[in-house]
Amino acid sequence: VCIADDLVPPHRENNVITWKSRDLLGRIGMVFQEPEHQFAASTVRDEVAIGPKSMGKTDEEAYSIADRLLERLNLSRFAKANPFTLSGGEKRRLSVASMLAAAPKVLVMDEPTFGQDFTTWTSMVQLIAGARDQGCAVIMITHDEPLIEALGARRILVREGE
């Protein structure tokens, strides 16, 4: 309920909500199961900077955020690379970094830690926990039981579509 309070104005009989793309970007972030589906920039660094720039940050601020996240997720050496040239695990880390950079109020992630080694997995868990601790509601679709335990997350189990 408190998530909805931040996302949607109080209900009125004929409540029409018109959000601009920038408004949605600041409210909801989505990490797709197939990271390639969310890439929009020609370089890794630009991909992470899109969110902060769209939220009104200066280029300097946006690239500072991008550089920090690329460093944390061991992607700095790919800053000038095209996102589509990365390995599967690197693409997944890039997709998480690009959504975290926008600092949304709600972050929906589909299998965010799939294909990561332990060191990178740990960094991703710390970043996700940090976002959560700063007030971001995190919703994950995952088979990663250790991730759920590490975050102390509430679990909703779906079996056979129910």
Where are these regions (language model features)?
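H-loop/switch region of ABC-family ATPase nucleotide-binding domains
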Residues: 142-143
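Conserved ABC ATPase signature
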Residues: 82-86, 90
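Catalytic Walker B motif of ABC-type/P-loop ATPase nucleotide-binding domains
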Residues: 107-110
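Conserved catalytic motifs of ABC-family nucleotide-binding domains
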Residues: 103
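Conserved ABC ATPase "signature" region
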Residues: 60-78
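Hydrophobic anchor residue at the start of the ABC signature
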Residues: 96
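Helix N-cap at the start of a conserved alpha-helix in ABC-type nucleotide-binding domains
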Residues: 118-120
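ABC ATPase C-loop
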Residues: 99-100
